[in-house]
Amino acid sequence: MSSVPAPREYFLDSIRAWLMLLGIPFHISLIYSTHSWHVNSATPSWWLTLFNDFIHAFRMQVFFVISGYFSYMLFLRYPLKRWWKVRVERVGIPMLTAIPLLTLPQFILLQYVKEKTENWPTLSAYEKYNTLAWELISHLWFLLVLVILTTVSIGIFTWFPKRQETSKPRPAAISLVRLSLIFFLLGMAYAAIRRIIFIVYPAILSDGMFNFIVMQTLFYVPFFILGALAFIHPDLKARFTTPSRGCTLGAAVAFIAYLLNQRYGSGDAWMYETESVITMVMGLWMVNVVFSLGHRLLNFQSARVTYFVNASLFIYLVHHPLTLFFGAYITPHISSNLIGFLCGLIFVMGIALILYEIHLRIPLLKFLFSGKPPVKQESRAAIG
């Protein structure tokens, strides 16, 4: 394992943070979209629906590429067991903390808002379990997937150095055209798996834990591995940080196809399978778009950016119940969708930042929401 730290990737830190924070306008716009959610405005907005669809079509694919990149970077820095422990603690502890402190109260709130408290006793044991699985994992699903990907990638990451010893990467072999074909085929494979499950045992697709543990992991594992490969091969990383007109145009066409599928597709037909193919290739092309823009605009050190990089996970964790509270109790009193959307951003972001500052002053909460053990004062003094 290397003891020499890799150069700081400021633009990747920034992109990861902004993708996390983008969850706030994503969920607030969901209130005002045509999509059915826990809470919705009286009249939907077409432009907020379009905005919401655009974010949804690529955000998490790019996020998992960055996660794979940093995961492999740390894999080279730590012994295997320590690497796994650190990575799982960093995402597992905040996830387990957020369930009783955030998503459980959120679930109780929604039961009263949607007037479902009287129906709860009538549900079967499985229906209660499945409802809790969906509602308690909620927006924390990506943390669960990261824990699974970290565990699964032990074997993959261990195999990478062995492969490097026996073969040398060829720049021509990892072109964006070839990657596009590979991800198209991966999207087709995922669609085929989903269709087979739909034919053989369709009910399992409505199971919350199966969706998070199996389906979401299967979809995002190629992006996670791609991120690790981008760290291993500088030429591959350079392809993503260099603007590509083909990727930009391809992403635009893919988004139009995504919208058409949303508009005319049917869940009983091939809508979800088609969406998986579209978002697989669009996610790849948006990696180039986002990385190249980020490399040009965000590749610098800034105290303000560092603040939001450090705060992004906490803000993301607390924003969801705040958004639902806003949608349930404040949205009905604002007639304008635009004003409601802007007020929602101010409301959620403002309270989230206040809560973030409060939690920084409580060591136990700071540990629980970050997964990072506190640095002992004695150690700091010794270093100083």
UniProtKB/Swiss-Prot annotation:
Membrane topology of this protein: Multi-pass membrane protein
Signal peptide region: none
Enzyme class: transferase
Subcellular location: Cell membrane
UniProt keywords, alphabetically: Acyltransferase, Cell membrane, Membrane, Transferase, Transmembrane, Transmembrane helix
Gene Ontology molecular function: acyltransferase activity, transferring groups other than amino-acyl groups; transferase activity, transferring one-carbon groups
Pathway stated in the Swiss-Prot or TrEMBL entry: Glycan metabolism; osmoregulated periplasmic glucan (OPG) biosynthesis
Transmembrane segments: 17-37, 54-74, 91-111, 140-160, 173-193, 212-232, 240-260, 274-294, 311-331, 338-358
EC number, UniProt record: 2.1.-.-
UniProt-listed GO biological process terms: glucan biosynthetic process
Superkingdom of origin organism: Bacteria
GO cellular component, one term: plasma membrane
Alphabetical list of HAMAP family matching this protein: MdoC_OpgC
Family: Belongs to the acyltransferase 3 family. OpgC subfamily.
Function as written in the Swiss-Prot or TrEMBL entry: Necessary for the succinyl substitution of periplasmic glucans. Could catalyze the transfer of succinyl residues from the cytoplasmic side of the membrane to the nascent glucan backbones on the periplasmic side of the membrane.
Protein's name in the database: Glucans biosynthesis protein C
Organism, scientific name: Salmonella gallinarum (strain 287/91 / NCTC 13346)
Organism placement in taxonomy: Bacteria, Pseudomonadati, Pseudomonadota, Gammaproteobacteria, Enterobacterales
